[in-house]
Amino acid sequence: MGDPRKPRKKWSPPGHPWVKERLIEEMKLMGEYGLRNKREIWIAAAMLRRYRHRARELLALPAEVREKEEKALLKRLYDLGLVDENATLDDVLSLTVRDLLERRLQTVVYKKGLAKSIYHARQLVTHGHIAINGRRVTSPGYIVRRDEEELIGYAPTSPYFKKAQQ
């Protein structure tokens, strides 16, 4: 079964390593979202793949059977901020990697104006200057839920917090 301290990887690399269009698109995403490496894109793609796969499975079920599970999936994606409140499974199937990258803590910190650039946002997060509801989060890849979005700010122990108070 494997060592529980070493969990199974949650991503898979692309099937063919040298597709020019994909490489160009990945480089654009890395620059736009300040990602450290392409693995972060592949992790987002794997998460998205799982949600889309689940949506396709639900579409194959009869309507009366899938209703409960469909609501659960749509509620989960709504809470993550990926779809609107009255979304359908077609909206889940139309999600892109960009939609998921927009929900990363690093991106949300930059969009809120707490950082000067997307790279600065990554550094603030990894150095422990950003907190969600007063609790420090040091993972730039943390997917911010819809209800946590307004709770993001500087950590109370951060020098940025003291500057923001003045």
From Swiss-Prot:
<dbReference type="GO" id="GO:0015935">
    <property type="term" value="C:small ribosomal subunit"/>
</dbReference>
<feature type="domain" description="S4 RNA-binding">
    <location>
        <begin position="103"/>
        <end position="165"/>
    </location>
</feature>
<dbReference type="GO" id="GO:0006412">
    <property type="term" value="P:translation"/>
</dbReference>
<dbReference type="GO" id="GO:0019843">
    <property type="term" value="F:rRNA binding"/>
</dbReference>
<dbReference type="InterPro" id="IPR018079">
    <property type="entry name" value="Ribosomal_uS4_CS"/>
</dbReference>
<dbReference type="InterPro" id="IPR022802">
    <property type="entry name" value="Ribosomal_uS4_arc"/>
</dbReference>
<keyword id="KW-0699">rRNA-binding</keyword>
<comment type="subunit">
    <text>Part of the 30S ribosomal subunit. Contacts protein S5. The interaction surface between S4 and S5 is involved in control of translational fidelity.</text>
</comment>
<comment type="similarity">
    <text>Belongs to the universal ribosomal protein uS4 family.</text>
</comment>
<dbReference type="GO" id="GO:0003735">
    <property type="term" value="F:structural constituent of ribosome"/>
</dbReference>
<dbReference type="Pfam" id="PF00163">
    <property type="entry name" value="Ribosomal_S4"/>
</dbReference>
<dbReference type="GO" id="GO:0042274">
    <property type="term" value="P:ribosomal small subunit biogenesis"/>
</dbReference>
<dbReference type="InterPro" id="IPR022801">
    <property type="entry name" value="Ribosomal_uS4"/>
</dbReference>
<dbReference type="Pfam" id="PF01479">
    <property type="entry name" value="S4"/>
</dbReference>
<dbReference type="InterPro" id="IPR002942">
    <property type="entry name" value="S4_RNA-bd"/>
</dbReference>
<comment type="function">
    <text>With S5 and S12 plays an important role in translational accuracy.</text>
</comment>
<comment type="function">
    <text>One of the primary rRNA binding proteins, it binds directly to 16S rRNA where it nucleates assembly of the body of the 30S subunit.</text>
</comment>
<dbReference type="InterPro" id="IPR005710">
    <property type="entry name" value="Ribosomal_uS4_euk/arc"/>
</dbReference>
<dbReference type="InterPro" id="IPR036986">
    <property type="entry name" value="S4_RNA-bd_sf"/>
</dbReference>
<dbReference type="InterPro" id="IPR001912">
    <property type="entry name" value="Ribosomal_uS4_N"/>
</dbReference>
<keyword id="KW-0689">Ribosomal protein</keyword>
<keyword id="KW-0694">RNA-binding</keyword>
<protein>
    <recommendedName>
        <fullName>Small ribosomal subunit protein uS4</fullName>
    </recommendedName>
</protein>
<keyword id="KW-0687">Ribonucleoprotein</keyword>
